Amino acid sequence: MHMPFIIDAHLDLSMNALEWNRDLRQPLKEINRREIGMTDKPDRGNATISFEELRKGNVGLVVATQIGRYVGPDNPLTGWHSPEQAWAQTQGQLAWYKAMEEEGQMAMIRDKKALEAHLALWKDGEPADKKPIGYVLSIEGADSFITVNHVEMAYAYGLRAVGPAHYGPGRYANGTDSTGHLNAMGKELLRTMDRLGMI
């Protein structure tokens, strides 16, 4: 039976790898076995994603996230105490994606040409078990952009999608369970994204 090509439009791969310490190159059974008895995070031992599982499901393209939340002094949520710390976290996540590219596990999709080449590879009739998972790099919440100029830096390294807000009060816009709107920095962020052709 022919499986359709599937795109996952939001996948926290680097967070799974770095915050949850999951080696996504391993089979799912092994990832979950290594978490037996762990209680530091909810759902330990219940991982659902690995590169092998993505390939089995013919999920050949994902919108892969970076995330680094900044929280102000009066914000009770968890997060970094400075945008610089949040930026550093996203750069560590980027380094993980690059390491997976070097291993042939992933392939960054920066433009239409790369997308078309990647789709052709996945539709060539060959088994998917050794094919790289394509990814469009996104960021979940813009809090880690120290300045709007950091959006341009991020675009240069391959970031193509930005969610200005994530959860709670944000530096550029307020997210889930908070009220408000795009502030002046948020509007400048959107203008920069528009100029760069980002989504």
Task: State what each model feature region is.
Residues 1-184, 188:
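N-terminal hydrophobic targeting/anchoring segments and the immediately downstream early-domain regions
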Residues 189-199:
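Substrate-binding cleft of carbohydrate-active enzyme catalytic domains
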